[in-house]
């Protein structure tokens, strides 16, 4: 009995630790929305005044938006659509398109790519608006500090991005406790004000929201573009599911995050009922004056943590796109010996910081930035619902009636929010769309370019089986040792092999043709790692399989080979690779400008030797000229 109690107690402690960690990563963005969401719903250009009716209507919209979008759609439905525990829009697209014919599969993966592009557009806006809205609390403390808001915001973000290469393994342990304190403060400030003015609780009645939508449809439609700010960051619940698990994310939401957010929004509404002038900054004005500065510090820490979650999420999404073949190889550094998900991509880091600095200098304030916020978020939400409908039909075997009953209303909500945000396009909504469009162009160009290169390489090469038969019938001069030839195709001879024979006229006594393939599953077991084929005396073919969440490793490949009695020692093996020198031409395939972009990306991509961590002194690289 005592042992069972101890086991149960240990399990409870472990679950609480994971839930606390999830607070620091998953809910950072969503948890900092109270800094600006309600304030922006009454922004002057929307035409809505903080009258009692207006306040009750907006708070009612906030309540039901959170309940429908977060609690029902994401927490109860979307989190069920996992792929071996992993989530995220690319994962959802992969799950929806699995075992489909080529054309529908390509369409669903394109939806996933659009979602990735929108996520990247959102990733530029989120750190900017979050930290800026927190530091703007200085103006509440004293207006004289207003000129320091932008410099302090930029300094905080430069320090944050500059420290990324150290990783978050150490300081990350503080994220959970800080966010726990943050949500506790949100709840306490809101609850105190609700007690002072409990009339705000009437906003739970959906009739306030519905009456507002029906009686003032024009203003209500435009206002929805600001209301959606209360659910920005919701996609992180799904994207980070692989790190913390569905249970911890659901537990954190139901037990702490949802109550704290609702209490704070209702508290801000109660404050506005009592003092409409507090619309200037209802979040900070919830607190007594003596608490303003400590609250500013805590809010800044919370927004830094929210920004870190977005940065880490961007690294993860970009790595996934690289492995799936939608982006060129680039340097991926692991910042933790224990957590495979903690990575650092230098190029992504500095591009993201550059975009954020430009955005902050351009828009100057969180209110101006709010106009740019929303389109990317709602677009991603709508795409998630579309892909979820496919998963519900194909994987969960839902009937059309059930999908129409549950998913269609959710899609209507998403599309309505997206349409409302398009009204902000000229005021700044174009910015995340521009970033998303650039990301989509880059990803589709790289994917198409690699397909063209592979077609041309296969066309210019020889069939592998015929080549091996010919080498055995007419063997060239053999030298001792093992040679590994990296190949993009399992059907043809690698060009590095053909060039080696042409120029050196020798063949190693043991030749391994190695092809690395990324599967549309997040993780593969060790038993699924390789397919080993003995092609004939001295010739082997190894096809190594990795999931799109894994990092291809030569060491692991050769460990799997050893299990199949093919022992390879890295230090005694020569690796032969072909390097394509690409030339843009007028041949059919891609537009000339896309060919130019692809050639530039190919030239600046990380070499296979560096990506696969092959010792440089064991590599022979042979060039091949290809016309696109």
Curated annotation (Swiss-Prot):
GO terms for molecular function: potassium ion transmembrane transporter activity; symporter activity. It is a multi-pass membrane protein. The chain crosses the membrane at residues 18-38, 58-78, 106-126, 141-161, 175-195, 219-239, 253-273, 285-305, 343-363, 371-391, 401-421, 425-445. It catalyses: K(+)(in) + H(+)(in) = K(+)(out) + H(+)(out). Keywords: Cell inner membrane, Cell membrane, Ion transport, Membrane, Potassium, Potassium transport, Symport, Transmembrane, Transmembrane helix, Transport. It comes from the Bacteria. GO terms for cellular component: plasma membrane. The keyword S-adenosyl-L-methionine does not apply. Transport of potassium into the cell. Likely operates as a K(+):H(+) symporter. This is Probable potassium transport system protein Kup 1. It comes from Aeromonas hydrophila subsp. hydrophila (strain ATCC 7966 / DSM 30187 / BCRC 13018 / CCUG 14551 / JCM 1027 / KCTC 2358 / NCIMB 9240 / NCTC 8049). The gene is kup1.
